[in-house]
Amino acid sequence: MADLNEVTQIMGANNAFVPGKRIKFDFGTDGTLLLDGVAEAVTNDNAEADADTTIKISFDNFKKMAKGDLNATTAFMMGKIKISGDMGLAMQLQSVTSKIKLNG
């Protein structure tokens, strides 16, 4: 199963960010992931980084979304995702996660 560093590499290699915008995933004790469309980079060492949207989700549920096993809208409606900031940007979440496919 992919860890945070592997996910960061996969997302970076697939340009999984929204140009000009910053989306931060807060995985709680599992860390953070910043999709930095300003710097055109994906990093995981920036817990305090500013973001246009912050999405709180468990790392396990994030991986399920990236594998296509969990729909972002469904996860939000079930309370598995909490969003702060630009809600419109968060609505693009499915298009971002569709740029990657995790195995296992």
Enumerate the predicted regions with their spans.
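Feature captures hydrophobic
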Residues: 1-104
